[in-house]
Design a protein with these regions (language model features):
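N-terminal helix-turn-helix
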Residues: 19-51
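Gly/Thr-rich phosphate-binding beta-strand-loop-beta motif of the actin/hexokinase/Hsp70
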Residues: 61-100
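Glycine-rich phosphate-binding loop and adjoining helix at the ATP-binding site
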Residues: 101-174
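Extreme N-terminal segment that seeds HTH/winged-HTH DNA-binding domains in transcriptional regulators
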Residues: 1-22, 26-27
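Electropositive phosphate-/nucleotide-binding environments in soluble metabolic enzymes
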Residues: 1-8, 33-37, 113, 157, ...
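Short, cationic-aromatic polyanion-contact patches
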Residues: 1-6, 21, 54-73
């Protein structure tokens, strides 16, 4: 559990501090250089981080290797469900929008089915060889977490419709 927390901490520090070195990570986290190197190596092997080689420095001495998140290999699928359309995007782990598209919705279509269809038929193919690290579905409305339903929304979902459960089931095979 502690190792997982430290992995997350190291990943977030690399994500927020492009070209950071292992030594700097050790200084910020108060972890040993050996521990930091082990954690960074695990993130590199997992394909989440890349070692960009030595960074340019003004002073002499050994130049540390710069680390960055691997935005080319990792994306998050984002679907924003609007009244008349779905806005689709793939956002790389380093914050770049790698793909963007729009799909119209008509009043007769089941939005839940369209969301799942957009994910499997548009976003996954657009991701190519990149790993889809997660799916973010934006639904404008008030969510009842206990019942996994929506109280109020502008997208035409009836109150009490278990849309969250239906989306979970529709995307479960991923």
């Amino acid at each position: 559990m502690i190792r997982t927390e430290n992995l997350c901490k190291i990943y977030h520090l690399i994500n927020n501090n492009a070209n950071i070195s292992r030594a700097r990570l050790a200084g910020i986290t108060n972890l040993s250089k050996t521990t930091v190197s082990s954690l960074v190596d695990e993130l590199i092997r997992g394909g989440y981080v890349v070692d960009c080689g030595t960074e340019a420095r003004a002073h002499q001495g050994r130049r540390p290797n710069a680390l960055q998140v691997d935005g080319d290999s990792n994306v998050v699928a984002v679907i924003s469900w609007r009244r008349a359309r779905l806005d689709l995007a793939l956002v790389s782990s380093d914050g770049r929008v790698a793909f963007r598209d729009r799909l119209p919705l008509n009043e007769q279509s089941d939005g839940t089915d369209r969301v799942a269809d957009a994910f499997f038929r548009r976003l996954l193919p657009a991701a190519g060889g990149a790993r889809v690290m997660g799916v973010c579905i934006i639904i404008p409305g008030i969510v009842n977490e206990e019942q996994r339903s929506i109280y109020s929304t502008v997208i035409g979902v009836d109150p009490g419709d278990p849309v969250i459960e239906r989306l979970s089931e529709a995307l479960a095979r991923y």
